[in-house]
Amino acid sequence: MPNAPAKVIPGDIEEIRVRGARVHNLKNIDFVIPHSAITVVSGVSGSGKSSLAFDTLYAEGQRRYIESLSAYARQFLERIEKPDVDEITGIAPAIAIRQKNSTRNPRSTVATATEIYDYLRLLFARIGRTFCLRCGEEVRKDTLDEIAAKVLALPEGRRFYVLYELKLSPDPAPADATNAPNAPRARKPIRLTQDAVRESLISLRKRGFNRLYQSGRVFEFATPEDLLDVNFTKPVYVLVDRLALSPEVRSRLMDSIEICYREGRGEAILEFVPDAPDEKPERMVFNERFECKKCGSIYQEPEPRLFSFNNPYGACPRCQGFGNTIDFDLDRVIPDKSKSLADGAIEPWTKPRYRQLAIEMRKFARTKGIPVDVAYRDLTITQRNAILDGDKKEGYEGVKGFFNWLERKKYKLHVRVFLSRYRGYATCPDCNGTRLRPEARAVKVAGRSITAVCQMTVKEARPFFDGLKLTELEAAIAEKILEEIQQRLRFLDEVGLDYLSLDRLTSTLSGGETQRIQLATSLSSRLVGALYVLDEPSIGLHPRDTNRLIEILKGLRDLGNTLLVVEHDPDTIMAADYVMDLGPGAGEHGGKLIFAGTRDQMLKDPHSLTGRYLRGELKILVPPRRRKPQGKFVKIFGAHSHNIKGLDVMIPLGLLVAVTGVSGSGKSTLVYDVLYKALQARRTGGNWREFCDRLEGDNSISAVEMVDQTPIGRTPRSNPATYLKAFDCIREVFASTPEAKKRGFTPGHFSFNIPGGRCEACQGDGTVTVEMRFLADVELVCEECRGTRYKSSVLDVHYKEKNIHEVLQMTVREALSFFAPNPKVTAKLRVLEEVGLSYLRLGQSGTTLSGGEAQRLKLAAHLTRQDNNGILYIFDEPTTGLHFDDIQKLLTAFRKLIDGGASVLIIEHNLDVIKSADWMIDMGPEGGDEGGRIVAVGTPEQVARNSQSHTGKFLAKSLNSRNGGNHGVSSVPLKANSVPNPDTSTVE
């Protein structure tokens, strides 16, 4: 991708000028942002980066664009308030690309989200070839060119008739193509009348036809007595033309065939005149129906909607395009596949009521030679299917027959309860999870159906489309379509998503993956002159892939777009054309523009906190000593999920353990889909064996906490104070004041969630929603309480000259000072300061928090626990949204949890956190099918010395160049996919 020269001097080029920005904590700042350049906004958490980038510039750019639309169009778009700013000039229409995955649509996939699937549907509709589901022959209709070529290839001079069958009455209705494949229906006997024959002949004369043909004889209309010899109870043909084979008759032949198709309901017949009177005439039949010429099955001609699982025309009728159905779940029916049939592998038949069925099953198995004393998973596919499907001739209905019988009995309550234990989402048996009807799956390009193409990863799809071998005509038709598909695949590859399959549900993607898909889609749209506002695009990216992301950003810039990137990644900051550093602190102590200029200028600026870290003046040091494994481990044997197959791993407890690896290497699969789910299933009595073969050491874990980035609440009522239970203490403080006692107020009167003291006009929301019918709903400040949420009588109660509403508007830092005499309140709030959230307001809506803020708020809640002993905490990229300075606080919080007896397991790419871990498990070596294995384990120093580890290569640079060496630890590389013994590791 070509690199344009950096455009970094605002005075030399067009720019966005902002004067007097006061959104949230911004301190009336003025700044400029150069057009057609990459501008990075940096600063500690809460310094005002998102307020500047999203709530000011994006909001105004989007608002102005929406205001330019008609009132009708505006009703379908989100209403955006004008930001609190004096003036913004030079702004372009804005596009926000956030790290949040808000997709919950079970039909949305990577292919549909990137528009690749739209082009695939078009490609298969235009050049796809349909193959018969019955006999495998290609399904086609006879075109005029193909017929002419086939006929003219015969020896010259042969004479023949061009005919079509005379239909004296309508045929039965043709088979419904949507139910294909169906054999052609037999013609019903026709009962003729003289009037019907006369009307048909008159109609033929009017249309210019003068001859009929039957059994080798030609009958002229000019001699009506000849027609008396025609037997109209047998097939009669209209003679369209008489020809002799030669190259000169090509055009005339095609015209005649076209007439037959039009008049003969899509069918044409060529009958060759025999050389001898006793010879049987040779006949060739052609038709324009889209059917299999071998077995007669009729199909629907491919068109884009046939390949859409969102359209009833193309969706599988059984699952309606979802790919799964609610059916009996085999994993619940046979939860422990290590059991044999004799030991009760089929769980429902171990119940007293149905034990007789187990006896019949074992009897059937013996007659079929199926071993009953072998583990179910060791049976062959044929043997398993025999047990499941049964054999009615042998008197055994099978497991499926058993559940079908129960379905007929589910009018009984106890049967419905019994069935519910074994129900679940199962792959649709009709489409095998492909979502499309059989006719769509019968269409192929280069031997692959559209569902087979979508099952490919981006990495597999690129060479497939690059190497497509097409005919000259197909290549001309598909040229532009293939160009769009290849371009989108290339961009997905360049943003580090080559391991994703095209049919991967977008609801299962991480926030970082979702953002990079949006980034790739934006680049493929080749939009110019737009303002792109990005929220930490490096999240979820391994350091190896960061350079590819930077090239994507430069590509967007080189198209003529302006990029405003909120970012903490040092490589991305150093690649920027222009840098703005906000601070100096968070919340009320932030919101000031500390520095604005080029990256080189920032490295020399003494006031920029980011610059001080980048030039090495400040750094996150390697801990002086690492904790050693104390002999307690969670051991997983035979882990299997997604790209992990048969993996053995030991995770030491009581340490900070980092799971690392390139994108798609299996980190989340190992930690969440295997470890977390298996531990939860073991604790709740579920089937943990569906995640691994053996699980040991979990008795050392008292609880498992997944601290993710999901919101703390779905309504504006949730806030930091209520989440940490600090608001309970604050309400008690207000209820204990003399004024509250005088009025008879209890702590409940100071709650906005229950009736009593809250404003009933807005029910404690502070806002009311007005339905505008034909316009978007408008949310207005409540006129009764003016947004305070409380009745005036409650607001009259003061503590230290502040009412409850004013307290909720305080930041955590302000509240700590305000409630200093109340240790119960400060004890709960102080943990927010420890995790770097002192800038949050107590009453700030939980829906406004970023994913990283929500995760750290949950971490703070866990830090308030009295007893963390034996708890395993799992974090997925906890550094999301964190500045270098905030990472120090996060690591301190982790150490506090571990000092309290907990274990901390993190999935992380940030090298500063990785080098601070006590133990590492590095996955890889690549993503997708080339991942799912353990590349290296041990201390960061050990992994850094492993030549097979991509993480190790970058970690070695971080340990040596930025942090004063590797502490002299020597180690040997550990073999992949082995269970290491942490006790033998050298740790200083």
Predicted regions and their residues:
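Conserved phosphate-binding elements of NTP-dependent enzyme cores
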Residues: M1-E988
